[in-house]
Amino acid sequence: MGDITGEAIVLRNASVLAAEIGGELVLMSVSQWHYFGLNSVASDIWERLASPMRVEALCESLATDYDGDIQVIRKDVMELLSKLASRELIEVEA
């Protein structure tokens, strides 16, 4: 898998199971059988990926909603998306 860019389209992998456990959203990859816990901001990102979304639009909407620095948000989002993609929890379309 190559680097995820701002122009890439990302969305949830439809086969991933999600459940709230102890106030944390936990994802399970059926294909790889691992669990992945998400904090509140990562859970918000997961909710937004219910529909396909361009990475840069995701970063911009988070910067607006959280009143944060777009550069910091972009870095953090790219890191999270890379982790999710490497575990087959999201799909990435170049």
Write out the residue ranges for each language-model feature.
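Long, low-complexity, charged/polar intrinsically disordered regions in eukaryotic proteins
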Residues: 1-29
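Long, charge-rich, low-complexity alpha-helical segments
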Residues: 21, 34-94
